[in-house]
């Protein structure tokens, strides 16, 4: 089958090579990926609506290389102006309805990778993102405990956490915020949050940026920097697992390995969109920024930024500790 037309949100979308296998071990096709997003459209659109999207493209499936397209291809009907970390302007893909997600799948996208800000104001995030990533020797059960601590601390600071499986080994917890703060301020709040969780769960949670020093569940505060993305809720990942929202009453029982394309189809039929309501009560970031003020007053400065970002004022050396020791030799 060379080309079909998919009806999505009242629009006819041209879709080529629908029977192309993107998951060789499972036999899932390009059309299977599109149908997944059509099935869970209310949640997938809610997660990406008006957000600039990096296009992570797997043109030859998950058994081959992928590449990122940051600037929106001219074939897409929707794009939004943004500023990249270099301060250069650009235009990125954006989702208005599920037909725009199908357009992304047509380009070889499997998982959706939106910014935490929305058009028209893409400079001020409306989402705080907590990415809990277990290091070797730790696993999903450890992420459950850290996620529970994150929920409690968010509530203490007037924010509501919304958890989901990452589609890999970890958990993501999102909190909606008013779009009043810059990316720098949101990242600063995320770093203070992560450090407080590390204090509450010593030996289990970690904020160590350098992998050689990490032990435990890493809270990746840098995911809140401009142009960083995390797979959106309801994304099908290259692992073959869906990044599945769950209720806090499930934090002790949710099994990420059950969230395959087929398993998630049954879950969606049973529970529907568990992110319904996430946009209803955005919170204030002031409580977390007060924690950042206290950390800095106590002598805790910034942490390293990702390597491709411009050097930041007050940032420590962006060199891994073992390399520094070797150089000082």
For each predicted feature, which ranges?
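C-terminal accessory nucleic-acid interaction domains of nucleic acid-metabolism proteins
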Residues: 1-34, 45, 49, 108-127, ...
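Long, well-ordered alpha-helical scaffolding segments within enzyme catalytic domains
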Residues: 36, 140-159, 186-201
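Short beta-strand
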Residues: 55-58, 161-167, 207-211
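Catalytic palm subdomain of template-directed nucleic-acid polymerases
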Residues: 174-188
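Nucleic-acid 5′ end/cap handling module spanning
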Residues: 141, 164, 177-179
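Catalytic micro-motifs at enzyme active sites that drive phosphoryl/nucleotidyl and oxygen chemistry
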Residues: 115-119, 159-165
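SsDNA-processing nucleotidyl-transfer enzymes
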Residues: 2-9, 38-136, 140, 144-148, ...
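Short, conserved phosphate-binding/catalytic loop or strand-edge motifs used
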Residues: 165-175
């Amino acid at each position: 089958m060379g080309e079909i037309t998919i009806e999505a949100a009242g629009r006819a979308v041209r879709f080529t090579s629908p029977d192309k296998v993107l998951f060789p071990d499972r036999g899932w096709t390009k059309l299977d990926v599109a149908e997944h997003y059509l099935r869970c459209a209310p949640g997938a659109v809610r997660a990406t609506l008006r957000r600039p999207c990096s296009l992570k493209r797997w043109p030859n499936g998950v058994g081959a290389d992928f590449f990122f397209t940051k600037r929106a291809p001219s074939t897409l009907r929707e794009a939004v102006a943004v500023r990249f970390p270099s301060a250069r302007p650009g235009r990125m893909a954006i989702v208005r309805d599920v037909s725009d997600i199908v357009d992304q799948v047509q380009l070889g996208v499997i998982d959706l990778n939106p910014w935490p800000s929305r058009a028209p104001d893409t400079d001020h995030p409306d989402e705080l993102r907590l990415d809990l990533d277990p290091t070797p020797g730790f696993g999903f059960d450890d992420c459950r405990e850290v996620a529970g601590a994150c929920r409690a601390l968010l509530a203490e600071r007037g924010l509501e956490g919304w958890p989901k499986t990452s589609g890999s080994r970890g958990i993501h917890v999102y909190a909606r915020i008013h779009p009043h703060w810059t990316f720098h301020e949101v990242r600063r709040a995320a770093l203070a949050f992560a450090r407080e969780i590390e204090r509450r769960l010593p030996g289990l949670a970690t904020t160590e940026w350098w992998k050689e020093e990490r032990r435990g569940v890493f809270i990746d505060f840098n995911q809140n920097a401009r142009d960083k993305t995390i797979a959106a809720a309801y994304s099908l990942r290259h692992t073959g697992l869906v990044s599945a929202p769950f209720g806090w009453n499930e934090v002790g029982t949710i099994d990420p390995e059950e969230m395959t394309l087929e398993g998630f189809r049954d879950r969606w039929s049973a529970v529907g969109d568990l992110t319904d309501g996430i946009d209803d009560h955005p919170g204030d970031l002031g409580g977390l920024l007060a924690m950042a003020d206290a950390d800095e007053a106590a002598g805790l400065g910034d942490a390293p930024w990702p390597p491709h970002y411009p050097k930041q004022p007050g940032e420590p050396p962006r060199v891994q500790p073992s390399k520094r020791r070797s150089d000082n030799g």
